[in-house]
Curated annotation (Swiss-Prot):
Gene3D superfamilies: 3.30.1130.10. This is NADPH-dependent 7-cyano-7-deazaguanine reductase. HAMAP family: QueF_type1. The active site is at C34 (thioimide intermediate), D41 (proton donor). GO terms for cellular component: cytoplasm. Pathway: tRNA modification; tRNA-queuosine biosynthesis. GO terms for molecular function: preQ1 synthase activity. Substrate binds at V56, E57, L58, H75, E76. It comes from the Bacteria. Its EC number is 1.7.1.13. Belongs to the GTP cyclohydrolase I family. QueF type 1 subfamily. It is found in: Cytoplasm. Catalyzes the NADPH-dependent reduction of 7-cyano-7-deazaguanine (preQ0) to 7-aminomethyl-7-deazaguanine (preQ1).
């Protein structure tokens, strides 16, 4: 298994696909770079989802999140990109990604992006 940052998310079979249950994963080690100032942005990322057939392999998630540390991204962009990548890989029933960024310049930013599969097919809800 790799030990370097990677954009490759891995999935493993859900042991209870017949049941609706929620998985919550939190890390306070997320870092990216502000594309305007070049300064680091630190955030606590919380991922909540109801899986269908797949769950995320945690080490691959750690390396995926780590891959952003030297990349320039706005808060809203990176939160939605994380959601999109996880939804594409896991095909969950529902998922929410919350990025709670540390205060910079006196401003505290929290971005919440949601996805919910509907009877008509996938539907992505707007970021808060």
């Amino acid at each position: 298994m790799p030990t370097q940052p990677s954009k490759e998310l891995e999935r493993i079979p859900n042991p209870k696909p017949e049941r609706d249950y929620e998985i919550e994963i939190t890390t306070n080690e997320f870092t990216c770079v502000c594309p305007r100032t070049g300064q680091p942005d630190f955030a606590t990322i919380t991922i909540r989802y109801v899986p269908d057939q797949w769950i995320v392999e945690l080490k691959s998630l750690k390396l995926y999140l780590w891959s952003y540390r030297n990349e320039g991204h706005y808060h809203e962009e990176v939160t939605n990109t994380i959601l999109d990548d996880l939804v594409r890989t896991l095909e969950p029933r529902r998922m929410t990604v919350i990025a709670d960024f540390n205060i910079r310049g006196g401003l505290h930013t929290v971005v919440t992006a949601r996805y919910e599969r509907t009877a008509e097919g996938p539907a992505r809800l707007a970021a808060d």
